[in-house]
Amino acid sequence: VLGTEEACTGDPARRAGNEFVFQMLAQQNIATLNGYGVTKILTTCPHCFNTIKNEYPALGGNYEVLHHATYLQQLINDGKLKVEGGAYKGKRITYHDSCYLGRANDIYEAPRTVIEALDADLVEIDKSKANGLCCGAGGAQMWKEDEPGNKRINTQRTEQLMEVYPDVIAVACPYCNTMLTDGVKTENKQDEIKVLDIAELIAQNNGY
């Protein structure tokens, strides 16, 4: 754990077109990571995962990079993480695919395997996996003011997810979590539908 030595990966800067800031942040991180001899990195953000895995190698940062969805799946499959408690047994859970986890890195099944381990009722919407709609935060859009239009993207995506009447909308990305939480609040459904990261689901199920 690097603490204050860890800087942003630079993903938002590069997506927003500020290559100078991206290069500065990336090189700072790579120097720190290489200085400690880091070989494996676990991320909880698909944006960080994609940047470190696919963009840092060109700058001298070569690491084995895991997203926590894959890591949790491995722990469950290897019997190192017991999913006990049954807090979500039979609950209707739909999963929103992160763009950078799914389309960019083809990780679709790992988060679903984690949800299924809860003995929950995993319900898919029509627009899922490669056909899923962005939550509205990708490409540095999270930091932009709203553009003219009839509906915010996060509201549209939330409405799609609500079509299957879920108890929980599961995510594996902090950006998606924020955008869909706001979407649920916009629909005044925050008392009925929870937006939770798959790691939160496991932790709550196991009593943490």
Each language-model region and where it sits:
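Iron-sulfur cluster-binding electron-transfer modules in prokaryotic oxidoreductases
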Residues: 1-208
